[in-house]
């Protein structure tokens, strides 16, 4: 069995370690690699997949939306999000799925106060997460027009970008941008003032991000990107192989690797 994650850049991905851990635990013989695919090479790569050179692929920035025209059909969540992070075979069809939202929803399941959420960013991950959130969602993005478009698609609202936004209305705040990831590891997308919200960051390298460190220092509850990463990967793995992976094992392996790197 041959699997891969594609993106540009892609060298930072921990997906190979996670999926190969699960393959071994399931007694399956397979290989999972990272492939740096630039935009103009995406269609040619999908043609390789169609020749059964791969049994499944994961998709990350910047291809989550760009890959859609090259697939046969989309799962409902991917169609709603307009973004794909998993491509798998269903018979002779290449199917696009989006497990970002369900992965985040499972990670958030123990938090019962999610009635008014702020989502920072309006890219593929945000589009996957927004429809899975309970209650009202407000979208904030550096390009306000994009925030308004994405919010309107899901019947939600948008606010103009501001690092000093009044956070008092929100009980959950989710960073879906790359702010906090290298090379911007010393930056945060917002200033955490006058809030009691759960602070979430989908970034898993580094962990915790500066945003989460500041949240902890302020006595706030936090949710890092590791569990979401593992849960969305687990849903992809099940589509690829038909096997349910060990979530605890996956989280343990990833956290250990992050601590050592």
From Swiss-Prot:
GO terms for biological process: amino acid biosynthetic process; aromatic amino acid family biosynthetic process; chorismate biosynthetic process; shikimate metabolic process. The active site is at residue 64. Shikimate binds at residues 13-15, 60, 85, 100, 204. HAMAP family: Shikimate_DH_AroE (MF_00222). This is Shikimate dehydrogenase (NADP(+)). The gene is aroE. Keywords: Amino-acid biosynthesis, Aromatic amino acid biosynthesis, NADP, Oxidoreductase. Gene3D superfamilies: Leucine Dehydrogenase, chain A, domain 1 (3.40.50.10860), NAD(P)-binding Rossmann-like Domain (3.40.50.720). The keyword Chaperone does not apply. Its EC number is 1.1.1.25. One of its GO terms (cellular component) is cytosol. GO terms for molecular function: NADP binding; shikimate 3-dehydrogenase (NADP+) activity. PANTHER family: BIFUNCTIONAL 3-DEHYDROQUINATE DEHYDRATASE_SHIKIMATE DEHYDROGENASE, CHLOROPLASTIC, SHIKIMATE DEHYDROGENASE. The keyword NADP applies. Involved in the biosynthesis of the chorismate, which leads to the biosynthesis of aromatic amino acids. Catalyzes the reversible NADPH linked reduction of 3-dehydroshikimate (DHSA) to yield shikimate (SA).
């Amino acid at each position: 069995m041959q699997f891969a994650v594609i993106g540009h850049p892609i060298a930072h991905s921990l997906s190979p370690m996670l999926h190969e851990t699960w393959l071994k635990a399931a007694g399956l013989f397979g290989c999972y690699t990272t492939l740096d695919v630039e935009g103009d090479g995406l269609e040619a790569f999908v043609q390789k997949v169609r020749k059964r050179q791969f049994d499944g692929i994961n998709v990350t920035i910047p291809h989550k939306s760009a890959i859609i025209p090259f697939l046969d059909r989309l799962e409902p969540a991917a169609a709603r999000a307009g973004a794909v992070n998993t491509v798998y075979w269903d018979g002779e069809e290449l199917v696009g799925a989006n497990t970002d939202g369900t992965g985040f929803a499972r990670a958030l399941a123990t938090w019962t106060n999610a009635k008014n959420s702020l989502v920072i960013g309006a890219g593929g991950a945000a589009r996957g997460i927004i429809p899975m959130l309970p209650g009202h969602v407000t979208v904030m993005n550096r390009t306000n027009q994009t925030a308004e478009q994405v919010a309107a698609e899901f019947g939600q609202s948008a606010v103009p970008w501001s690092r000093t936004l009044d956070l008092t209305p929100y009980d959950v705040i989710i960073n879906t941008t790359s702010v906090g990831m290298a090379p911007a590891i010393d930056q945060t997308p917002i200033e955490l003032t006058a809030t009691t919200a759960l602070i979430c960051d989908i970034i898993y390298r580094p962990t915790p991000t500066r945003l989460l460190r500041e949240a902890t220092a302020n006595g706030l509850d936090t949710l890092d990107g590791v569990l979401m990463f593992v849960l969305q990967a687990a849903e992809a793995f099940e589509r690829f192989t038909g096997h349910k992976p060990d979530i605890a094992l996956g989280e343990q392996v990833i956290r250990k690797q992050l601590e050592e790197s």
